[in-house]
Regions:
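Short, T/G/N/S-enriched strand-turn elements that build extracellular solenoid repeat scaffolds
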Residues: 35-42, 56-65, 70, 117-120, ...
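Extracellular beta-strand/beta-solenoid scaffold signature
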Residues: 58, 82-95, 110-117, 138-148, ...
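Acidic, glycine- and Ser/Thr-rich low-complexity intrinsically disordered tracts
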Residues: 291, 295-417
Length: 417
């Protein structure tokens, strides 16, 4: 037995040594074994380079070695094809549980579950990566394309995701995050920042999704509440795709035609964005209570507080309202939803002399001729009649700028913003 183990180890080391001598790993007769063995025997800090071509894979590739870079020759040149992935062989395409991981210049296609998942680590960088379900929008597609969860120091840049049945780019329960210069389309949610602290989301294109960009905090998760997000200089347009999310998932309730939704997150600044032609609403600021979903989480804060919306460009949109409260309120809102829709729900326990403290308010200014509605759902939830108003007067003013996340240039594997 010892001799067999020794022989196996020698063979694996020889395989990697040959790969290093011969250059990048090339597609061959058993791509699953070749790539998984390379990941298993990689030394900390190793660069695993893949040649151009299509690697045919039938199970999850897993990595638990720190500081590894997985590098292809371009997102349209090096393709990890999981079309042959069988149930029971792992849901993800690539699963990483090690610090300081970088993946760049390759594509992941047609996974059963998530495209690339990094979980419970420090330092994760995704550069010039494409994740795609090539059949287009389908409820049976994997949930997430690029999926860091419970990660500190995340960089996602210059990447593309299409066809995710939940979110194309999903950053969950994480801290110190930069998401920039990506394109997401034909997903249920294009980009979702969830229960995360310190996120810069900028220069992205989110188009032709059900919802373009979401900043959420959800209950019943290990990491509570999200805050300190800056969303700026993004193009968020034409997110009118019918919702194809899996039943029961929170995103399955997102109305088609949603540009940006901020829900239950605090201290969020949105500025310099171009938000165009999202048929339900260009921007919605809501509490979790407005979803109508119940939860059992005493530590959860369902209210959205401290949101500053300024210097954005709003065009079109709001002409086909739908979703939970559209029928009841669209007539009161003038037959269409304005550019900015606020549910009007505030935490009654935080009122001071009947008013919301300045630092917890919604402020809206310098958005051109953007219009606004307060649906006053707080009165509805209290058993009264709503006093719907389009008056922006109470929302004039500003909040301090949200601080940018930590400089990721100091974090191995996470680049420089």
């Amino acid at each position: 037995m010892k001799r067999n183990i020794l022989c196996t180890a020698v063979c694996l080391l020889a395989l990697v040594a040959c790969a290093e001598q011969d250059g990048p790993l090339h597609p061959g007769d058993n791509d699953q074994r070749t790539l998984q063995e390379a990941l298993l025997v990689a030394e900390p800090g190793a660069v695993i380079e893949l040649a151009a071509g299509r690697f045919e894979l039938d199970a999850t590739l897993s990595l638990d070695v720190e500081g590894v870079t997985l590098r292809g020759q371009g997102m349209d040149e090096t393709i990890l094809d999981f079309a042959g992935q069988a149930p029971g062989t792992g849901g993800e395409g690539v699963l990483v549980t090690a610090n300081d991981f970088t993946v760049e210049s390759l594509a992941v296609e047609n996974t059963l579950g998530d495209g690339i998942k990094v979980e419970g680590t420090t330092g994760a960088a995704f550069r010039s990566v494409r994740v795609e379900w090539t059949n287009g929008p389908d409820t049976n597609n994997g949930a997430y394309g690029l999926y860091p969860v419970q990660v500190t120091n995340v960089l996602i840049e210059d990447s593309q995701v299409r066809g995710a049945s939940d979110a194309g780019i999903y950053v969950g329960q994480s801290a110190n995050v930069v998401v920039r210069r990506n394109e997401v389309w034909e997903n249920v949610a294009g980009i979702e920042i969830e229960n995360t602290t310190g996120a810069d989301v900028y220069e992205n294109r989110a188009h032709d999704n059900t919802g373009g960009l979401l900043v959420f905090s959800l209950p019943e998760l290990p990491v509570k509440d999200g805050r300190d997000a800056r969303v700026y200089d993004n193009d968020i347009a034409d997110n009118n795709l019918p919702n194809f999310g899996k039943e029961g998932a929170i995103v399955s309730t997102i109305p088609a035609g949603s540009g940006v939704i901020v829900m239950a997150s605090d201290n969020v600044e949105l500025f310099g964005n171009r938000i165009h032609n999202n048929q339900n609403s260009n921007l919605a600021v809501i509490s979790y209570l407005s979803t109508g979903r119940t939860y059992n989480d005493p530590g959860y804060d369902p209210y959205t507080e401290g949101v500053y919306v300024h210097d954005n460009e709003f065009v079109g949109g709001g002409d086909m309202p739908n979703g939970a409260f559209a029928d009841a309120f669209v007539a009161l809102a003038g037959g269409a939803f304005p550019d900015i829709v606020w549910d009007g729900v505030v935490n009654p326990d935080k009122l001071v002399d009947g008013a919301v403290p300045d630092e917890l308010r919604l402020y809206v200014e310098n958005n051109g001729d953007a219009d606004f509605v307060n649906l006053d759902l707080g009165s509805v939830f209290a058993g009264g009649e709503p006093s719907v108003t389009t008056d922006l007067g109470p929302h004039q003013g500003s909040l301090p700028a949200v601080p940018r996340p930590v400089d990721l240039g100091a974090a191995t594997g996470a680049g420089s913003p």
